[in-house]
Amino acid sequence: MQTLANLLNTIPAIDPAAMSRAQRHIDGLLKPVGSLGRLEALGVQLAGMPGLNGIPHVGKKAVLVMCADHGVWEEGVAISPKEVTAIQAENMTRGTTGVCVLAAQAGANVHVIDVGIDTAEPIPGLINMRVARGSGNIASAPAMSRRQAEKLLLDVICYTRELAKNGVTLFGVGELGMANTTPAAAIVSTITGRDPEEVVGIGANLPTDKLANKIDVVRRAITLNQPNPQDGVNVLAKVGGFDLVGMAGVMLGAASCGLPVLLDGFLSYAAALAACQMSPAIKPYLIPSHLSAEKGARIALSHLGLEPFLNMDMRLGEGSGAALAMPIIEAACAIYNNMGELAASKIVLPGNTTSDLNS
């Protein structure tokens, strides 16, 4: 039987030789060197991922949406009723939410996973990995036990690996849960060492006159639970939530298969911070989709060393940004595989790294 520690030890390193070969190939394509900017760097990054066998390509695509409620909702940190989590999860099964529409446009499947929705019975059409009916209220207790966090991580890692066996080569992460920007801010504050006031934002349109209470709740949660910033599982268990644990599991699972995973917004940055504490080897597999409009986004991304490809003023969550960015991954693969080569043409660009072919 696989353990979390064993799976973390299976995460392969990026292949530098494959990346060097990819860089030489891209430099020789029918264009000035570097003229396709970050698409070129993305192609090199993908080539280094062992799960893609040295050739950037996209097979099946999947967005995994982790759905859970949060006990900290009781502290008045969100204006949406808690029941919206279950209602929106049901809407996802009908394909009518933002992530579902964007994923369909990108040709990706959406996997809606119940890891902790507060309903008496499981919701039909959802993948049931429910740990409990919502996490603990982090302002007065830990979100969950370490054992619960480790088991959910392992379950999601195994589910992700099974999808990879069935042909998924590009993963996206998403979440759904009222009040979940509060535990996300607690995670970001803990791991980055920044004060809660610097990272707590309005989430889903929280009135600004309620922001001080939200900041205070995050500060109380950290003071009470004393999460260890060096221990990603501890941070998730103390001040996180089941949806955040689930997203971290997708990242770890994809990386263990040597495959890329697209981050979404602020919630996914928080999960990534915790996942990287568990295994720094996953960082090269993380691809940032968009810059979240949430207040602490830049702080989290700076700590991760990541620069998003898109800035659309989005803060919906759900995995919407990950779905929106999937065509960018496909574009990087397309230029790598389909562009002609300078060597096969009569174009010579000696030492030229800046000029346009048409100039």
Swiss-Prot record:
Disulfide bonds: none annotated. Its EC number is 2.4.2.21. Keywords: Cobalamin biosynthesis, Glycosyltransferase, Transferase. One of its GO terms (molecular function) is nicotinate-nucleotide-dimethylbenzimidazole phosphoribosyltransferase activity. One of its GO terms (biological process) is cobalamin biosynthetic process. Pathway: Nucleoside biosynthesis; alpha-ribazole biosynthesis; alpha-ribazole from 5,6-dimethylbenzimidazole: step 1/2. NCBIfam families: cobT_DBIPRT (TIGR03160), PRK00105.1 (NF000996). This is Nicotinate-nucleotide--dimethylbenzimidazole phosphoribosyltransferase. Homodimer. The active site is at residue 318. The gene is cobT. It catalyses: 5,6-dimethylbenzimidazole + nicotinate beta-D-ribonucleotide = alpha-ribazole 5'-phosphate + nicotinate + H(+). The lineage of its organism: Bacteria, Pseudomonadati, Pseudomonadota, Gammaproteobacteria, Enterobacterales. Catalyzes the synthesis of alpha-ribazole-5'-phosphate from nicotinate mononucleotide (NAMN) and 5,6-dimethylbenzimidazole (DMB). Belongs to the CobT family. It holds the Pfam family DBI_PRT. The keyword Glycosyltransferase applies.
